[in-house]
């Protein structure tokens, strides 16, 4: 049975710039916002945009990510006419098939895509924080009779070299594209979100690999090839909140922005919910002696200290005399007495002993998942 549009989320990235936080966890599975993982935003956008069939392409350290996604039930992707499929590298008679790039990952999963039989494929990155209506982007794609539509946004010119940068004509047709240029000519950046006509993309990928001209990356190979061939390639301008949380600084900054009641993500918006898989925990307990201001405190937390402008994920234990400020504490972490944590990210299931100081002065301080720092006498 044919479907109109298949979603493909590229979720195999290692995220080396996140250091300790991705040592054993794929970047899209890194926690965010107290109750989410980064990939929840792409999955929830699919659910809210009526994209009912989604393939998640994984590679690096996929166990936590796979367990989190499960059968897709939190996002409504477990119905009769909907579903989520985890797509991992595999071996065949031709040998191993590790993904060499973004478009190579799609090429290696052609059989799955053909099985879904879509008219269009929506390519997404699994490591960005944003809300977006993909149906509106698809309507723009169809109205312009595009072969490829690239979602774009304006970024500060000094940051443009981190992105694929393009120039457009007056009708937003893309006439020039350069992946991460050293000297960018514009500040119109690719968001790593694409809609392709599947038959044409399939033809381009198969021809490239069969003729010894492999198309391994969308930004470096496929998009420039489309433009050079005179294909109808258009930009779709996005003006909402979008953050690439690929560095410690950007993850911390986005987490702190999450605490702003006026932030553009508006996580309380019932018309565009962000869904996630969460364990059932007891209610949070805030003691009489505690001081909690401008903070998100997850279920199962016990707080007997001071928490200021910070996020505590589920089941975080904060003992008496401890001060946490401008920090993101991930789930399951135990923090002892008289601890000072400022400008920091603490990984899941970490243990922080009594009288420890973790202060990010010139850069964000990071404690990895399961890391132990100091000793505490009252650990529960």
Swiss-Prot record:
Reaction(s) this enzyme catalyzes, per UniProt: alpha-D-glucose 1-phosphate + ATP + H(+) = ADP-alpha-D-glucose + diphosphate
UniProt keyword Nucleotidyltransferase, yes or no: yes
EC class name: transferase
SUPFAM superfamilies: Nucleotide-diphospho-sugar transferases, Trimeric LpxA-like enzymes
UniProt entry keywords in alphabetical sequence: ATP-binding, Carbohydrate metabolism, Glycogen biosynthesis, Glycogen metabolism, Nucleotide-binding, Nucleotidyltransferase, Transferase
EC number: 2.7.7.27
InterPro entries referenced in this protein's UniProt entry, alphabetically: ADP-Glc_PPase, ADP_Glu_pyroP_CS, GlgC_bac, GlmU/GlgC-like_hexapep, NTP_transferase_dom, Nucleotide-diphossugar_trans, Trimer_LpxA-like_sf
Binding positions (alpha-D-glucose 1-phosphate): 164, 179-180, 190
A Pfam entry, by short name: NTP_transferase
Superkingdom classification of source: Bacteria
The protein's annotated pathway: Glycan biosynthesis; glycogen biosynthesis
GO terms assigned for molecular function: ATP binding; glucose-1-phosphate adenylyltransferase activity
GO biological process, one term: glycogen biosynthetic process
Free-text function comment from the UniProt entry: Involved in the biosynthesis of ADP-glucose, a building block required for the elongation reactions to produce glycogen. Catalyzes the reaction between ATP and alpha-D-glucose 1-phosphate (G1P) to produce pyrophosphate and ADP-Glc.
Family: Belongs to the bacterial/plant glucose-1-phosphate adenylyltransferase family.
PANTHER family recorded: GLUCOSE-1-PHOSPHATE ADENYLYLTRANSFERASE (PTHR43523:SF2), GLUCOSE-1-PHOSPHATE ADENYLYLTRANSFERASE-RELATED (PTHR43523)
Subunit annotation: Homotetramer.
Protein name according to UniProt: Glucose-1-phosphate adenylyltransferase
Origin organism lineage: Bacteria, Bacillati, Bacillota, Bacilli, Lactobacillales
């Amino acid at each position: 049975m044919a479907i109109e549009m298949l979603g493909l989320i590229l979720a195999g990235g290692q995220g080396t710039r996140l250091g300790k936080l991705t040592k054993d966890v794929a970047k899209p599975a890194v926690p965010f916002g107290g109750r989410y993982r980064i990939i929840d935003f792409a999955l929830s956008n699919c659910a809210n945009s009526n994209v009912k069939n989604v393939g998640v392409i994984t590679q690096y350290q996929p166990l936590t990510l796979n367990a989190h996604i499960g059968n897709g039930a939190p996002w409504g992707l477990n119905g009769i006419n909907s579903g989520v499929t985890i797509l991992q590298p595999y071996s065949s008679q031709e040998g191993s098939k590790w993904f060499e790039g973004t478009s190579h990952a799609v090429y290696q999963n052609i059989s799955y895509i053909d099985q879904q039989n879509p008219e269009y494929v929506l390519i997404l990155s699994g490591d960005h924080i944003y809300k977006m209506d993909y149906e509106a982007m698809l309507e723009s794609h169809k109205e312009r009779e595009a072969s490829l539509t690239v979602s774009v946004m304006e970024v500060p010119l000094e940051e443009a070299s981190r992105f694929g940068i393009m120039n457009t004509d007056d009708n937003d047709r893309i006439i020039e594209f350069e992946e991460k240029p050293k000297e960018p000519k514009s500040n119109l950046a690719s968001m790593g979100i694409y809609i392709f006509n599947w038959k044409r993309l399939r033809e381009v990928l198969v021809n490239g690999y069969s003729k010894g001209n492999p198309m391994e990356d969308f930004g470096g190979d496929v998009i420039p090839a489309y433009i050079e061939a005179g294909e109808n390639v258009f930009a779709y301008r996005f003006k909402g909140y979008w953050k690439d949380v690929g560095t410690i600084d950007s993850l911390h900054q986005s987490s702190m922005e999450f605490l702003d009641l006026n932030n553009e993500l508006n996580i309380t918006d019932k018309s565009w919910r962000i869904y996630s898989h969460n364990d059932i925990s007891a209610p949070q307990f805030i003691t009489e002696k505690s001081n909690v201001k401008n903070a998100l405190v997850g279920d199962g937390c016990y707080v007997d200290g001071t928490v200021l402008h910070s996020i505590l994920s589920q089941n975080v234990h904060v003992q008496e005399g401890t001060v946490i400020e401008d920090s993101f504490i991930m789930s399951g972490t135990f923090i002892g007495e008289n601890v000072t944590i400022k400008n920091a990210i603490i990984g899941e299931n970490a243990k922080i002993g009594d009288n420890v100081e973790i202060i990010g002065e010139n850069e964000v301080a990071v404690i990895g998942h399961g890391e132990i720092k100091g000793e505490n006498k009252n650990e529960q």
